[in-house]
Amino acid sequence: MHANDIRQDIRKLLKERNAVLLAHNYMRDEVQEIADITGDSLALSQEAARTDADVIVFCGVHFMAESASILSPDKTVLLPRMDAGCPMADMVTAEALLEMKARHPDVPVVTYVNSSAAVKAVSDICCTSANAVKVVNSLPDPEVIFVPDRNLGQFVAKQSDKTFHFWDGFCPTHERLKPADVQRLKEAHPDALFICHPECNPLVVALADHVCSTSGMYDFCRTNPAKRFIIGTEAGILYRLRLENPDKEFILASPALVCPNMKLTSLEDVLASLQTMSPVVKVPEEIRVPAKLALDRMIAIPRD
């Protein structure tokens, strides 16, 4: 089937099903191109909750579709590739987190949204890479348990006077970016600014001109007068950066910055999902309610 025909069929079915198509910033270019909304995982789930769509087609990974289900329990949430998981989210289970909580009684758990619904359900508050510092510093407690990303946790800890207990999780894709990769590119392009995601290793973060979430990268690159940027996050972000800034050059910090799970979803998968109305991601109420509480506490913290 020709790509144009697939796109037409997707658009037709989205209309028929009263569905909204969400694509994460790391998706394949052709999936981002056809999406109704692109963004980071939480922003997408919040946007979806605000729409009057009956069906959410989430082009992302499993925990993202769970977040959409948590925030929109009355909508049908489709994840075109049920095998699109997140290795970092899988590094922590609710049972293991409860054991850690038992070792640190009365210490609040701050959980990065890149986590399963079950883990969110036994957490006190969630955070994103954009608001993690603000979330942690909003808590009155002198200590926090930070789950699951140790790299983001260390980035936050440098901007907080609290004592941190880190879960030993990480994003394998971001972890593949090495300081030597960055130094080599900075030498080759001395006029370029290096911006990276806080999921990168602290040794890489130390080299950055700016550290921010994916949504922060779009804003920074659009408003900064520099004409050349070295990008330290997953390759999918380049699609929109180049689209929005045709006069600027974007260099991926390493060819290893490709997440295999984010690249699983194809246009064919999206079409098949709409045709069959499957696979469905539905978070059970006993997990959804406490998980939503952790997300709601985060959402209630005022933005700058």
Curated annotation (Swiss-Prot):
Its EC number is 2.5.1.72. Belongs to the quinolinate synthase family. Type 2 subfamily. Pathway: Cofactor biosynthesis; NAD(+) biosynthesis; quinolinate from iminoaspartate: step 1/1. The keyword rRNA-binding does not apply. Pfam families: NadA (PF02445). Iminosuccinate binds at residues 24, 41, 112-114, 129, 197-199, 214. This is Quinolinate synthase. GO terms for molecular function: 4 iron, 4 sulfur cluster binding; metal ion binding; quinolinate synthetase A activity. Keywords: 4Fe-4S, Cytoplasm, Iron, Iron-sulfur, Metal-binding, Pyridine nucleotide biosynthesis, Transferase.
